[in-house]
């Protein structure tokens, strides 16, 4: 990112602020909305994904820990559906790792094509007012597998994953359960970045 000029840094900061507002309100969607605009500024997703991953780690962990403390004191009910979360992770973890491997090894042009294609499909569902829903157990399995892979490749698998989680997790627990899921999936991605010696852009996290 050292080659960027001031106005590009300013645009990146504004996009990250916007994605943070979306994530804090919905619990998901910040990356999917921000990544296309970031790639217009610089087309290397490996630059932005470590920073986005760090934001997810900090935001999700602080939110869940705060709510967990309230639940422990009896002020609120437990906010994480651990049982379903564990079952979903067993399905998603291998596709997730395959997606991360693809992100690290595939050419940037191919990764960008995948990202823009997926976001284009998401956009079409919005324009056509079509809600992504999983109505059968087989569809649940496919959504979690594909969502896990997309999450590994680009962190934008949330719409597919949420379609499944919203069926089995109560509305009260959904947001925090998703935050724990993002935290675990992002830890896998960041660990892979470290192993692959990818620049985590630590100075730019500030």
Model-assigned labels for residue ranges:
Residues 1-3, 74, 100-110, 132, ...:
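Membrane-interface helix termini and inter-helical loops of multi-pass transporters
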Residues 1-4, 8, 76-80, 84, ...:
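Membrane-helix interfacial "entry" motifs
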Residues 46-127:
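Membrane helix-loop-helix hairpins that form the core translocation module of multi-pass transporters
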Residues 9-83, 143-152, 156-206:
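Small-residue-rich hydrophobic segments that form or flank transmembrane alpha-helices
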Residues 8-12, 84, 88, 112, ...:
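Residue-level signature of transmembrane alpha-helical entry/exit and packing/kink sites
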Residues 4, 28, 51, 92, ...:
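A generic helix-loop boundary/linker signal
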Residues 115-117, 124-147:
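Alpha-helical multi-pass membrane helix bundles of inner-membrane/thylakoid proteins
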Residues 44-45, 110, 136-138, 170:
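Membrane-helix interface segments
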